Design a protein with these regions (language model features):
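Sequence/structural signature of outer-membrane beta-barrel proteins
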Residues: 2-8, 35-44, 62, 71-79, ...
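Detector for outer-membrane/organellar transmembrane beta-barrel domains
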Residues: 84-151
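Flexible, surface-exposed loop regions and adjacent strand-edge segments
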Residues: 14-16, 154-156, 187-196
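Residues that define the transmembrane beta-barrel architecture of outer-membrane proteins
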Residues: 14-18, 47-51, 64, 80-86, ...
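Outer-membrane beta-barrel "beta-signal"
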Residues: 93, 164-172, 177, 197-215
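Repeated loop/turn-to-beta-strand initiation elements of outer-membrane beta-barrel proteins
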Residues: 28-34, 62-68, 94-99, 133-139, ...
């Protein structure tokens, strides 16, 4: 991808990222996997890559699909930013809703940043529109609430991210933006928009290609 976007925020200072993962899913619904990507938050930062580990259980009950699991985010060069989340997704037809809750975070995020269970959350709403050509249009709205993202990623406490995407045969294109609110000091948008060429208050165009292999 030309830009690693996570919850509306660039994780690669709007530069290219190479990503990959391995998943195992059992017929019972249990799954486990790992995923990695290069990351960068400033031209002289200490980050090199993100390595995630996750596991969960997914299934269906009539017309309703569900998925619940745990995701641990590990950042190679600075263990102080490692954290974990519990997530749950419910889907009906082409619509799905996901809630992610902060479960654990390293205690050295910064002064006053010892975060406890569910002190930050992310809610996402997604809708997929299949086209006759085989392509799919995706509509997404997400909302982050809590102080953790300010400590971890410099973002203001609460914000929305919105995007529209189209995907076919592994190719994808997306237009995304965020609506960053003010932090407690009232200067969050200006400070964060200028940090490390992130420009997360601007509209971003993202393209990518992915492929799957079965072992």
């Amino acid at each position: 991808t030309n830009n690693y976007i996570w919850r509306g925020l660039t994780q690669s200072i709007s530069e290219a990222a190479v990503q990959g993962g391995i998943d195992y899913a059992d017929d019972s619904g249990f799954y486990i996997g790992t995923w990695a990507s290069n990351v960068s938050y400033d031209s002289d930062d200490v980050y090199s890559y993100e390595h995630d580990i996750y596991f969960g259980y997914a299934g269906e009950a009539g017309d309703i699909s569900y998925d619940i699991g745990y995701l641990y985010y590990n950042y190679d060069s600075n263990a102080g930013f490692d954290f974990g989340e519990l997530y749950g997704t419910v889907g009906v037809g082409n619509f799905s809703a996901t809630l992610s809750l902060l479960v654990n975070a390293e205690p050295d995020e910064g002064p006053g940043q010892d975060f406890g269970f569910a002190e930050a959350s992310y809610t996402s709403l997604d809708y997929v529109i299949p086209l006759e050509s085989g392509a799919e249009i995706g509509l997404h709205a997400g909302f982050h609430e809590g102080d953790f993202m300010y400590a971890f990623n410099g973002a203001t406490d609460d914000y929305w991210d919105l995007n529209i995407s189209i995907a076919k045969d592994g190719f994808s294109a997306m237009v995304t933006t965020t609506t960053l609110g003010d932090d407690d000091d009232g200067d969050g948008v200006e400070d964060y928009a200028s940090m490390g060429a992130r420009d997360n208050d601007e509209i971003k165009f993202v393209v990518g290609y992915s492929m799957d292999f079965e072992l």
